[in-house]
Every structure is written in structure tokens, then in C-alpha cells.
């Protein structure tokens, strides 16, 4: 097991990539502290985690709340004495251009994505420095590299995550802390389906998105979780500041 006896904190576990990654980490032997504002989804993930070789705990709250991030990290460290892996997978999308996006929605998207990366890194990295080792995994998007239509806040936030990831990687490399991003393509998750639902012709938009990938299909959350496992484990010991693209050939096509 690649994460045997490791302690991981994963945000955004109520569904999708966060859930799949948390369950895979547990299956590989980790204790996973689960974080989400959706208590029902988080509890479902906790049940799945507890049916693996690992175990976990549930922490309900807003990832953009710095006090909550600090308190959760302190609780995990108090209980387990360390944090080996931090994965920030919480996210949402409001759609819209820079003209049509409501300022409150813009701020909320950045609070969740960028704040939810910065604040949790800010809380967890000092413990990793004391340990002399740690892995941080952030979630970007292929759209942060390619651009896209009608989703300006989300795409801008994902671009900021890539820049923040690279900055953290350089800042903490000599502390033994690796920081990497995953840039998924369109992954078949509730978040993706909600984004399609904003359009009048949902099936047409789904087909266009599916066919944009060279592989002509959507990705699965479990496929992204495998990339996260690689970055969380010692297998990627010489990898930091990287953006791992898991996009079914979207960017290449």
C-alpha cells in the first residue's frame, strides 16, 4: 500500500474528484481527514472510506474560512501528530463572462478555489516543515491552460491555482515539501453536470464537450484520483511545481 500509515487531509470530498481521491488514499492505507460543507455527501464519503483498509474523520465547514482551516489542521495534528498529504479539491462554478458574472459570485468562486488552496496550505505547511516532508496537491483545470467560453471566474481561479502551486513549490522545496497541480479535462462529476445544466440545449453542450477530447469521452473521477495518488506517494519524490494534465487529449487535440 502506497500510503500506509500516512495522514491525509482532503477538501471537497462530498462528490467527484475529492471523494474518489479520499477513498483511494484510504484504500492505499491512509487515514483521511475529510472536509466539505456538504455534510451529507461528506458522510457518504466517510462510509466509503471506512469500507477500505484505511479510516477517516469528517470536518464540516467552508474551505474559504481561514479559522476553520486552522482549527481543522490543528485537530488533525493533535490527534495524529503529523500531516503527510494535503489535497485541495473543493470547487464550484457559476458560469458567465466578465460582464455577466455577479461580483458576489466572482468573489465566492475565488474564495473557494484560490482561498481554499491558500488558506489550507497556510495552515498545513508549517507542520510539514516541522516534519521535513509533505505533499500538497491542488486541482486546476485544462481550461486554465487553454481558456474557454462563458466561465470566466472559474477559469481565472484555476489559472491562479497553477501560479500559486508553482510559487509554493519553489518556496518550500528545500523543506522537503512537494507541491503539484492536476489539470483535469471534463470529468463526469456533479460539478460538470451542473455546468451543463446552465445551457438551454444540455445534450448538445455535453456532446460538444465530449468530442473536444481526443479520446471522445469524459474522464472519470477515479482516473484523476490515480494521478493524485501518484503525487501523494513517494513514487513522485522528484516531482514538484508540476501541472499533471489528465484531460483525455483535450489540450493536444
Task: Give the ranges of each region predicted by the language model.
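C-terminal substrate-recognition "lid" of short-chain dehydrogenase/reductases
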Residues: 2, 118, 217-246, 251
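Conserved glycine-rich cofactor-binding loop
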Residues: 14-16
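Short, small/polar-rich loop/turn modules that mediate ligand/substrate recognition or access, typified
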Residues: 87, 173, 178, 239-241
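Substrate-binding pocket helix/loop in short-chain dehydrogenase/reductase
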Residues: 97-98, 102-110, 151, 209
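Active-site helix of classical SDR
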Residues: 121, 157, 165
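Alpha-helical segment proximal to the catalytic Tyr-Lys
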Residues: 126, 170-174, 237
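Residue(s) in the substrate-gating loop at a strand-loop-helix junction
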Residues: 141
Amino acid at each position: 500500500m502506497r500510503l500506509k500509515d500516512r495522514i491525509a487531509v482532503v477538501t471537497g470530498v462530498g462528490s467527484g474528484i475529492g471523494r474518489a481521491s479520499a477513498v483511494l488514499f484510504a484504500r492505499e492505507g491512509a487515514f483521511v481527514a475529510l472536509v466539505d460543507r456538504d455534510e451529507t455527501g461528506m458522510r457518504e464519503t466517510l462510509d466509503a472510506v471506512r469500507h477500505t483498509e484505511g479510516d477517516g474523520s469528517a470536518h464540516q465547514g467552508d474551505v474559504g474560512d481561514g479559522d476553520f482551516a486552522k482549527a481543522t489542521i490543528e485537530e488533525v495534528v493533535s490527534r495524529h501528530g503529523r500531516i503527510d498529504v494535503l489535497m485541495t479539491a473543493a470547487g464550484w462554478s457559476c458560469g458567465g463572462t466578465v460582464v455577466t458574472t455577479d461580483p458576489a459570485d466572482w468573489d465566492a468562486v475565488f474564495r473557494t478555489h484560490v482561498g481554499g488552496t491558500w488558506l489550507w496550505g497556510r495552515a498545513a505547511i508549517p507542520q510539514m516543515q516541522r516534519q521535513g516532508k509533505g505533499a500538497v496537491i491542488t486541482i486546476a483545470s485544462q481550461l486554465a491552460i487553454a481558456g474557454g467560453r462563458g466561465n470566466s471566474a472559474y477559469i481565472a481561479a484555476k489559472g491562479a491555482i497553477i501560479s500559486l502551486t508553482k510559487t509554493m513549490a519553489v518556496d518550500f522545496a528545500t523543506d522537503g515539501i512537494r507541491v503539484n497541480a492536476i489539470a483535469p479535462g471534463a470529468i463526469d462529476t456533479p460539478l460538470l453536470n451542473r455546468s451543463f445544466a446552465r445551457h438551454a440545449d444540455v445534450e448538445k453542450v455535453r456532446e460538444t464537450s465530449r468530442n473536444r477530447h481526443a479520446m471522445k469521452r469524459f474522464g472519470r473521477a477515479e482516473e484523476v484520483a490515480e494521478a493524485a495518488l501518484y503525487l501523494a506517494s513517494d513514487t513522485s519524490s522528484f516531482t514538484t511545481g508540476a501541472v499533471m494534465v489528465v484531460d483525455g487529449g483535450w489540450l493536444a487535440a
